[in-house]
Amino acid sequence: MRKLIVGSRRSKLALTQSQQFIDKLKFIDPSLDIEIKEIVTKGDKIVDKQLSKVGGKGLFVKEIQNELFNKEIDMAIHSLKDVPSMIPDGLTLGCIPDREIPFDAYIAKNHIPLQELSEGSIVGTSSLRRGAQILSKYPHLKIKWIRGNIDTRLKKLETEDYDAIILAAAGLKRMGWSDNIVTTYLDRDILLPAIGQGALGIECRSDDKELLDLLSKVHNHDVAQCVTAERTFLSEMDGSCQVPIGGYATIAQDNQIEFTGLIMSPDGKERYEHTALGTDPVKLGIEVSQVLKKQGAYDIIKKLNEAE
């Protein structure tokens, strides 16, 4: 096998999950020579704005995909939730490895439970999806946008006017943070995850047969089925970071996939949700999207995308 160059964002989390995946490959073949190349993406440069206000899909992947096309790197290790549902021609998701916990972590000052936060308490999040779902269930709370890596957000919780913050549990787990800092993990009934949350997508060139063969050895078929249902739903709904959209699939009994899709208005007042079972992940994602469109969910998306 030739020397492999892995493209990664420069954040601590991106570099850590890239190294963890490389370790997985080296466990299969210790002779592999793999190097990480750090790449700065457009999304990394935007630190003072809410990402949903910036617009555009692929804020964290476009520059990395360009390096794949130019053969500067051989593969990219993405957080799957950052990867748009349409992969450019010539590139492919070569494998979907094991999924980390897909839920969100709620961290509060003095570990006050979410349901006990008082009127006007401020919850920090960088996600419209989280904000909308929290406002829907707890309309007396205030959502305030928060950006930055995990360390920055935890520091802001201590030093600024936030009463609590919500962030992806997978990032905390991969960075080795103790469960002790988390007040609680919010299950799907409280906060439906983002599309692909907790999963990685390993992107490479479609014609790189040697690498695709290697990646097949760390591919998790069940996780791939689940995220395919989720990403099909995202594509069918024309979802973007301007839209509060959630989706989560699991393997149920009889090897069926159970998938729940969710579209909300940013203020949490409108909610469209549907759960279905099926064996074909693409058909399942389409089915749930069609139900939500009939309910009127697409009107929200159209409005938000037009305002972009």
UniProtKB/Swiss-Prot annotation:
Reaction(s) the record says it catalyses: 4 porphobilinogen + H2O = hydroxymethylbilane + 4 NH4(+)
Signal peptide bounds: none
Cofactor binding note from Swiss-Prot or TrEMBL: Binds 1 dipyrromethane group covalently.
InterPro entries linked to this entry: HemC, Porphobilin_deaminase_cofac_BS, Porphobilin_deaminase_N, Porphobilinogen_deaminase_C, Porphobilinogen_deaminase_C_sf
Pfam families associated with the record: Porphobil_deam (PF01379), Porphobil_deamC (PF03900)
Reported cofactor(s): dipyrromethane
Keyword vocabulary terms for this entry: Porphyrin biosynthesis, Transferase
Keyword Zinc-finger: no
EC number in record: 2.5.1.61
GO molecular function list: hydroxymethylbilane synthase activity
Disulfide bonds: none
Pathway: Porphyrin-containing compound metabolism; protoporphyrin-IX biosynthesis; coproporphyrinogen-III from 5-aminolevulinate: step 2/4
Enzyme class: transferase
Keyword Hydrolase belongs to the record: no
Record GO biological process: protoporphyrinogen IX biosynthetic process
Top-rank taxon, per record: Bacteria
Modified-residue entries (S-(dipyrrolylmethanemethyl)cysteine), positions: C241
GO cellular component: a single term: cytoplasm
Additional free-text comment from the UniProt record: The porphobilinogen subunits are added to the dipyrromethane group.
Subunit relationships: Monomer.
Family to which the UniProt record says this protein belongs: Belongs to the HMBS family.
Protein name: Porphobilinogen deaminase
Species: Staphylococcus epidermidis (strain ATCC 35984 / DSM 28319 / BCRC 17069 / CCUG 31568 / BM 3577 / RP62A)
